[in-house]
Amino acid sequence: MTAFPGTFAGRVLRYAGFAPRHEFTGARVAIIGSGAAVARLLPGIAAEAAKVTVFQTDAVWIVPRAPLPAPLLRRAPDRLVRSVARANLRFQVRDSWLRSRLTPDDTAGVAVHDSYYRTLRQPHCRLVTWPIARLAPLGVRTVDGIEHRVDTIVFAEDSRHIVRTIARGARLPATAARVGAAGRKEPA
């Protein structure tokens, strides 16, 4: 996860189950990670930060929280879950370019979150899908040569927030975590 060449001179936080209670007020923050872990952290960080740049390593399907019992959700057919996720993405992200960057392949996992797309659309939030070339003293340099200057880098890789694997016949395990609207981990 942090095996990028180069050295960053600012603050580096590694996701280890923390809720965004760190001080991000007025800061330029980079969040590097997969869609599920980023979905959990982005709303809390964006509420404080002046600018947030999300470096997405992998997209995941995002479905809104449904007022349905967990056993019913666990038995939902993969095709139905994928259809709900696609409709959620289309409904919440009108910009076709951004939507294409947020669309995972059909084997991607699914995270439950109510505000990820809404937060990502805020003017001070930006999605970057170019691969990272290296860390620089003042930020993150992507392979397109752009150096994104930030004060803090948060590495957000945590597969525990992938709650289901689509198209592989997996069921939501009873111990799986779901990501809530406030970014809190909740039992399935």
Task: Pin down the residues of each PLM region.
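N-terminal FAD-binding dinucleotide-binding subdomain shared by FAD-dependent oxidases/monooxygenases
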Residues: 1-6, 21, 34, 39-41, ...
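Extreme N-terminal leader/targeting segments of oxidoreductases
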Residues: 2-16
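A short, basic/flexible loop-to-alpha-helix module at the beginning of a structural domain
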Residues: 13-26
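Short coil/turn connectors at secondary-structure junctions
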Residues: 26-27, 50
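Beta1/beta-strand and adjacent pyrophosphate-binding region of the FAD-binding site
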Residues: 27-35
